[in-house]
């Protein structure tokens, strides 16, 4: 079966920069995935994702069912465009390409988009169905989390 692409978008009640800073944080990843997926390599981690880094470890469904060893490579983190791209794989999943895009709507609101392209061979359809549920729940959690986000005063290095 060919790869499938799923796109989900939601508007968040928080400034784009605050949401973007949270996207770059493993803490937000843990918050929006809690109860659905557990990924021990990010438990307790407080430093931001780094472009080019790979995080690998066992993925747990609903926090209790061991799935497979999952690999996440942070392929690109573009702070100016507020875009994060990860290339992931593990178990039945040959490729899980995930883009997160944050776009300002005004000074107090932003648009958050998850776009994922999944190739899991014969299992692409059921894996994509799971992804639909996963991102629906994650975005509902982003909507609850967004109004609680605080501004960060982190200075980010700019390449060049």
Describe these PLM feature segments.
Residues 1-50:
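Hydrophobic ligand-binding cavity/cleft-lining segments
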Residues 85-133:
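Beta-strand/loop substructures that line and gate deep hydrophobic ligand-binding cavities in soluble
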Residues 12-14, 61-63, 92, 118-120:
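Beta-strand elements of well-folded, non-transmembrane domains
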Residues 13-17, 75-82, 101-111:
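A short, structured loop/turn motif at beta-sheet edges
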């Amino acid at each position: 079966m060919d790869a499938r692409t799923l796109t989900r978008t939601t508007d968040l009640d928080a400034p784009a920069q605050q949401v973007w800073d949270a996207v770059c944080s493993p803490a937000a990843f843990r918050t929006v995935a809690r109860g659905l997926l557990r990924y021990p390599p990010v438990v307790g981690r407080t430093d931001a994702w780094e472009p080019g880094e790979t995080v690998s470890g066992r993925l747990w469904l609903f926090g209790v069912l061991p799935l497979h060893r999952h690999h996440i490579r942070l392929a690109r983190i573009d702070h100016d465009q507020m875009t994060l791209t990860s290339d992931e794989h593990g178990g039945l999943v040959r490729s899980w390409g995930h883009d997160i895009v944050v776009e300002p709507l005004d000074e107090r609101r932003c648009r958050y988009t998850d776009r994922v392209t999944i190739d899991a061979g014969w299992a692409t359809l059921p894996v994509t169905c799971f992804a639909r549920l996963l991102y629906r729940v994650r975005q509902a959690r982003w909507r609850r989390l967004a109004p609680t986000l605080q501004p960060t005063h982190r200075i980010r290095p700019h390449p060049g």
